[in-house]
From Swiss-Prot:
<feature type="binding site">
    <location>
        <begin position="55"/>
        <end position="58"/>
    </location>
    <ligand>
        <name>carbamoyl phosphate</name>
    </ligand>
</feature>
<feature type="binding site">
    <location>
        <begin position="231"/>
        <end position="232"/>
    </location>
    <ligand>
        <name>L-ornithine</name>
    </ligand>
</feature>
<feature type="binding site">
    <location>
        <begin position="133"/>
        <end position="136"/>
    </location>
    <ligand>
        <name>carbamoyl phosphate</name>
    </ligand>
</feature>
<dbReference type="InterPro" id="IPR006132">
    <property type="entry name" value="Asp/Orn_carbamoyltranf_P-bd"/>
</dbReference>
<dbReference type="InterPro" id="IPR006130">
    <property type="entry name" value="Asp/Orn_carbamoylTrfase"/>
</dbReference>
<dbReference type="InterPro" id="IPR002292">
    <property type="entry name" value="Orn/put_carbamltrans"/>
</dbReference>
<keyword id="KW-0055">Arginine biosynthesis</keyword>
<dbReference type="Pfam" id="PF02729">
    <property type="entry name" value="OTCace_N"/>
</dbReference>
<comment type="function">
    <text>Reversibly catalyzes the transfer of the carbamoyl group from carbamoyl phosphate (CP) to the N(epsilon) atom of ornithine (ORN) to produce L-citrulline.</text>
</comment>
<comment type="similarity">
    <text>Belongs to the aspartate/ornithine carbamoyltransferase superfamily. OTCase family.</text>
</comment>
<keyword id="KW-0808">Transferase</keyword>
<dbReference type="GO" id="GO:0006526">
    <property type="term" value="P:L-arginine biosynthetic process"/>
</dbReference>
<dbReference type="Pfam" id="PF00185">
    <property type="entry name" value="OTCace"/>
</dbReference>
<feature type="binding site">
    <location>
        <position position="82"/>
    </location>
    <ligand>
        <name>carbamoyl phosphate</name>
    </ligand>
</feature>
<dbReference type="GO" id="GO:0019240">
    <property type="term" value="P:citrulline biosynthetic process"/>
</dbReference>
<dbReference type="GO" id="GO:0016597">
    <property type="term" value="F:amino acid binding"/>
</dbReference>
<dbReference type="InterPro" id="IPR024904">
    <property type="entry name" value="OTCase_ArgI"/>
</dbReference>
Amino acid sequence: MVKPNKLANNNYLSSFDMTTDEFINILDLAKNFKNKKINIDPNNKVLGLIFDKSSTRTRVSFQVAMSRLGGTTIDLNPITSQIGRGEPIKDTARVLSRYCDVIAIRTFNHSDLEEYAKWSTIPVINALTDLEHPCQALADFLTIQEEFIDFRNVVLTFIGDGNNVANSLILCGALLGVEVRIACPRGYEPNVSVINKALEIYKNKNLLKIIHDPYDAVLGANVLYTDVWSSMGEENQKEDKDKDFKGFTINSSLVRKANKDAIILHCLPAYRGKEISAEVFESKISRIFKQAENRLHVQQALLAGLLS
């Protein structure tokens, strides 16, 4: 049975806030939680949630994870709290540090998250920013590990916008030595600084590829992953993106070009007929709802690691 080790970094703002060993330990711990082989009571600790963006899976999975750990959750609505009236982040962070034991924040600007971490005296977790979605990536790689065991056998192809999800997949791929391919239209590549950070870690620089033809990108791949084309806050770009991403739908034709053991991932919500066909979404090779369940287990493990 795996026991939680205190994470060396007090915060989890980026996938790179963990070492490779810590990342693997969190996955192992998550599997123990999933199989109900471990029970940890963090002495009625309190998790504060600050979500500037809509959320279903992240919000609920954090609340359930904290409850299963024996703690409680306080959900701060930015509209009805003083945050919505413009209270400085440094003031909010210092006050919440006296009420809560850990804070999970979903916001637009990554710099705002870093400002919370700067002024907070308790752990801060990135529950999604425009730059990264590291908790999602933890669940993604737990799902991949459950399917393929050895990460060295994995070729992960992400098809779609080079967004926060793609950025976190790249960083985690670098930590674990996984081949990651990002298939996107020109002009929608992942963040350059993220790519450069990943290349500093990758022992084999050729394991990270940016490809503009989705059919080339899926050759030999055994994980096909997609996300919405228009992220939250990009609703005004939807029409343009729908045109630009034509041909980047994961459908049966694309799946046939991948490995025979390929699985399908999607971080949800999904728009059938856009980034993924309804047929593939509901197919036997889809692991989408297993992936969604794993959000709960990895976040329970993450909270245990930060609070232990």
